[in-house]
């Protein structure tokens, strides 16, 4: 890229990466205001629909907007091998995202004012094994969730691959301040 920041007009989408392959995205860093109104999309090998489509902050595991703080008034931090998140200081992804022919990453500003986005996206041009998997991420939100109904996080995935994680966040309505019921269940193949 030729600049450390891009101004994204309200209601507009800009292209952050458009690279011919083969290659791999190796690291992404964003900072500044990265709230839910920024929508990141990633397309591999000229596909029509994105393999990744999510609010930028949610992609990095921050289910609430960037102003969310914990009980001590601090921003929650996610520190793992593949994601490092310190809201207000930076959002980092180290997931490798291979592509054979083309990688395209866009950012949409769904807000009502122009916003600056500070970012670095790095990778390498290299041969990619034919059987290499593509990176996918999805976003779901339901408010309110229907009482008594099972909430499905993800469904309909087919083919080989690895499930690497989920961010599940809950909020309460009214005076009820405790979420105490429910369990996470995962079904694979013919379960």
Task: Locate predicted features.
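Beta-strand-centric surfaces of beta-sandwich/beta-rich domains
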Residues: 1-191
């Amino acid at each position: 890229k030729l600049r450390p920041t891009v101004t994204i007009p309200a209601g507009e989408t800009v292209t952050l990466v458009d690279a011919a392959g083969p290659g791999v995205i190796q690291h992404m860093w964003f900072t500044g205001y990265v709230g839910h109104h920024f929508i990141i999309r990633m397309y591999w090998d000229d596909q029509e629909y994105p393999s990744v489509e999510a609010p930028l902050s949610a992609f990095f595991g921050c289910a609430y907007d960037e102003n969310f703080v914990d009980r001590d008034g601090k921003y929650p931090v996610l520190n793992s091998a593949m994601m490092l998140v310190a809201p207000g200081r930076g959002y980092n992804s180290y997931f490798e995202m291979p592509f054979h022919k083309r990688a395209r990453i866009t950012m949409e500003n769904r807000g009502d004012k122009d916003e600056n986005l500070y970012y670095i996206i790095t990778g390498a041009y290299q041969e990619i094994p034919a059987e290499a998997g593509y990176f996918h991420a999805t976003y779901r939100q339901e408010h309110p969730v229907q009482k008594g109904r099972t909430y499905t996080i993800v469904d309909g995935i087919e083919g080989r691959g690895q499930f690497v994680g989920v961010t599940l966040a809950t909020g309460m309505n009214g005076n009820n301040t405790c979420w105490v019921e429910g369990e996470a269940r995962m079904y694979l193949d013919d379960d």
